[in-house]
From Swiss-Prot:
Residues 138-150, 332-348, 419-435 have a biased composition (Low complexity). It comes from Mus musculus. The gene is Dmp1. Residues 98-119, 203-215, 362-373, 493-503 have a biased composition (Acidic residues). Interacts with importin alpha. This is Dentin matrix acidic phosphoprotein 1. Residues 23-503 are annotated as: Disordered. Pfam families: DMP1. Residues 1-16 form the signal peptide.
Length: 503
């Protein structure tokens, strides 16, 4: 890659130097310099940086000034293909396009490369250079101003274009343009060098106080001074960029480290929050399950109480009803107390406690309270079974008393036994269908039975025939319901298998 760049550079020089010979009258000095350049090619590092610095102002010279030479165009086109910072030819346009791309990207390499104008000026600057020490100091000051302005060119691209036009004015007389342009640019840059002109062989430059009559020695001194100043500037610019880059890298590392810490903390906090949510959800599910079991057991106890009440109302006489009701009322507050204890357990389990120790303590309390509630449930169930046994014994006593009364009444006793049996069968069949209907029908049956008892005690044999018709009709109705339920099955489901018939 470097060899290709050197070949392109030599080809551009070979095309540019004959044009410079025709425009300049100092043929001797220019021929000697071309011989030196053809004999020894410039070093690659300084020459490449100075090549790119020369390419951008000459590329703008093509758009701003119409009287630029072919050498400037060819150099601007050839140098626009190479960037030492990138290593590959990223832009194939002119120098102005490359400068705009680098200004947009915010790269500082272009400003550093523009500072190295010295080596090329010292080697083949042409006869129109400023040869006195005063002019050299003025040009160094102007070049320093241009470097400072070029460093600020990233923020203001319009200012960078103006200063690049001034740099182009410095490079145009060095490349060997027309004598009038070189005179105007030298007067603007040199700071009042009136006696300078590009005519003659260098003897007219003595008016400005040259130290020697030899133009070659003064030019070489100027070239060395500019090379040293350019090297110092490049080192300073590199020194300025290096600490800023290191500081930026340190700041970025610290920001990344802090962001990682905050990210880890957020992860830890999220995991803790998820753990708390899972604990709270598990406790809520446990409390809900306990509530569901409590509600189921309460519903069971209520259904058992209802059945006990219905049986006691159907079979027991009026004198023994208050005793069974009092026993059932005594069983209800125990169940209410158990439900209240369960509600307290659920409220305790649902309380959000952030500490793990308090959570563990609450869980243990909730487990112990659940065990207590289960014990209370078992005790309530045993009480309900005892109440059922008491009610059954009361029913048996009532049946025995009724049998004694029936023995005294004669036929009425047998009729009352049939009524009690029919009422019990009807209540059982109807309870299996629906609880609400069973309650209403049991109440009506109990009222009918009490009325029939009163009528049997008062009327005697006249009412016995009517009471015989009623239980027979009710038994027939219950049998019809059972038969209808059996015959209303679909035809395909007569067998107990789940499969359809025929397969």
């Amino acid at each position: 890659m470097k060899t290709v760049i050197l070949l392109v550079f030599l080809w551009g020089l070979s095309c540019a130097l004959p044009v410079a010979r025709y425009h300049n009258t100092e043929s001797e000095s220019s021929e000697e310099r071309t011989g030196d350049l053809a004999g020894s090619p410039p070093p690659p590092t300084n020459s490449e940086s100075s090549e790119e610095s020369q390419a951008s102002p000459e590329g703008q010279a093509n758009s701003d000034h119409t009287d630029s030479s072919e050498s400037g165009e060819e150099l601007g086109y050839d140098r626009g293909q190479y960037r030492p910072a990138g290593g590959l030819s990223k832009s194939t346009g002119t120098g102005a396009d490359k400068e705009d791309d680098e200004d947009d990207s915010g790269d500082d390499t272009f400003g550093d490369e523009d500072n190295d104008l010295g080596p090329e000026e010292g080697q083949w600057g042409g006869p129109s250079k400023l040869d006195s020490d005063e002019d050299s100091t003025d040009t160094t000051q102007s070049s320093e101003d241009s470097t400072s302005q070029e460093n600020s060119a990233q923020d203001t691209p319009s200012d960078s274009k103006d200063h690049d036009s001034e740099d182009e004015a410095d490079s145009r007389p060095e490349a060997g343009d027309s004598t009038q342009d070189s005179e105007s640019e030298e007067q603007r840059v040199g700071g009042g060098s009136e006696g300078e002109s590009s005519h003659g062989d260098g003897s007219e430059f003595d008016d400005e106080g040259m130290q020697s009559d030899d133009p070659e020695s003064t030019r070489s001194d100027r070239g060395h001074a500019r090379m040293s100043s350019a090297g110092i500037r490049s080192e300073e610019s590199k020194g300025d960029h290096e600490p800023t880059s290191t500081q930026d890298s340190d700041d970025s590392q610290s920001v990344e480290f802090s962001s990682r810490k905050s990210f880890r903390r957020s992860h830890v906090s999220e995991e803790d929050y998820r753990g708390e949510l899972t604990d709270s959800n598990s406790r809520e599910t446990q409390s809900d399950s306990t509530e569901d079991t409590a509600s189921k057991e309460e519903s069971r106890s209520e259904s058992q109480e209802d059945t006990a009440e219905s049986q006691s109302q159907e079979d027991s006489p009026e004198g023994q009803d208050p005793s069974s009701e009092s026993s059932e009322e005594a069983g209800e507050p125990s169940q209410e107390s158990s439900s209240e204890s369960q509600e307290g357990v659920t409220s305790e389990s649902r309380g959000d406690n952030p500490d793990n120790t308090s959570q563990a303590g609450d869980q243990e309390d909730s487990e112990s309270s659940e065990e207590d509630s289960l014990n209370t449930f078992s005790s309530s169930e045993s009480q309900s079974t005892e109440e059922q046994a008491d009610s059954e014994s009361n029913e048996s006593l009532s049946l025995s008393e009724e049998s004694q009364e029936s023995a005294q009444d004669g036929d009425s006793s047998s009729q009352e036994g049939l009524q009690s049996q029919s009422a019990s069968t009807e209540s059982r069949s109807q309870e299996s269908q629906s609880e609400q209907d069973s309650r209403s029908e049991e109440d009506s049956d109990s009222q009918d039975s009490s009325r029939s008892k009163e009528e049997s005690n008062s009327t005697g044999s006249a009412s016995s025939s009517e009471e015989d018709i009623r239980p027979k009709n009710m038994e027939a109705d219950s049998r019809k319901l059972i038969v209808d339920a059996y015959h209303n099955k679909p035809i395909g489901d007569q067998d107990d298998n789940d499969c359809q018939d025929g397969y």
